[in-house]
């Protein structure tokens, strides 16, 4: 049995498009996505789920499609699963969805011909959606209350350390690498891990008590989207004694 200690990531997904495309905002997204084509990494995983939840929030009709060369002559948004190498300034998609740090790397490598044209977290609202949570075994929590309190404090402070001017990118990369299995490497490097990228990853710790309602809301939205029930009992959310 596990309990959730808190949320540690609040969304790192962004909208990319050619420089000439208009940026997506809460006020214009329904109109701009009419008849559009959207390329999305990991369409049948979290990235695609988050995109579709945002579209549902704005009552935007959409359809998952396979033929990437087709025109869209409807009022719906057509969504396609794409690979990372398909996200280019000359792609046939109006907008493309990807995650940091790949987003900033794409922008830099195309010399700004590809630009960030929307923030999926901002479009979702509510200070982003809960993308990753921290859990611990219930019996471990019960037997190690002080350790859990100290650990949660350290996790919260770590967000500040990541963004501190005195923290070098190489330090962050090494800190992550030190905790990976042998042979595994981080998905980012000291070259592409800027302070802006770290900030865009929305890494911060919100305790379970303070983010419970946000998590429940997002689970309900996932349930509606996928036709399955995702829920968490009150006992799942850790509250310090």
Functional labels for PLM-detected ranges:
Residues 1-77, 94-100, 113-117:
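Short, glycine-/small- and polar/acidic-enriched structural segments
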Residues 141-225:
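Secondary-structure end/capping motifs
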Residues 11, 34, 130-132, 232:
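Residues that flank catalytic or metal-binding motifs in active/ligand-binding sites
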Residues 76-175:
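Pocket-lining segment of extracytoplasmic ligand-binding domains
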Residues 65-80, 178-189:
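Surface-exposed intrinsically disordered loops and tails
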Residues 215-241:
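Conserved C-terminal helix/tail region of periplasmic/extracytoplasmic solute-binding proteins
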Residues 24-25, 35, 122-126, 203-212:
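Short, solvent-exposed loop/beta-turn-alpha elements that line the ligand-binding surface or hinge
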């Amino acid at each position: 049995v596990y309990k959730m200690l808190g949320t540690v990531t609040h969304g790192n997904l962004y909208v990319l498009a050619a420089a000439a495309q208009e940026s997506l905002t809460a006020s214009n997204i329904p109109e701009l996505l009419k008849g559009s084509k959207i390329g999305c990494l990991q369409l049948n995983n979290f990235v695609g789920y988050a995109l579709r939840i945002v579209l549902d929030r704005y009552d935007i009709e959409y359809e998952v499609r396979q033929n990437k060369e087709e025109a869209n002559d409807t009022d719906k948004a057509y969504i396609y699963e794409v690979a990372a190498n398909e996200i280019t300034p000359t792609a046939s998609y109006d907008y493309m969805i990807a995650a940091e740090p790949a987003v900033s790397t794409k922008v830099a490598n195309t010399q700004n011909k590809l630009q960030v044209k929307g923030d999926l977290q901002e479009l979702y609202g509510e200070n982003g959606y809960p993308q990753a949570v921290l859990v611990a075994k219930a019996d471990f929590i019960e037997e190690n209350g002080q350790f859990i309190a100290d650990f949660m404090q350290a996790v919260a402070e770590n967000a500040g350390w990541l963004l501190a001017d005195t923290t070098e990118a190489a330090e962050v990369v090494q800190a992550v690498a030190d905790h990976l299995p042998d042979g595994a490497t981080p998905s980012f490097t000291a070259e592409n891990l800027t302070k802006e990228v770290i900030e865009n990853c929305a890494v911060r710790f919100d305790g379970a008590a303070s983010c419970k309602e946000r998590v429940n809301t997002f689970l309900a939205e996932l349930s509606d989207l996928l036709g399955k029930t995702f829920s968490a009992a009150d006992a799942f959310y850790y509250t310090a004694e």
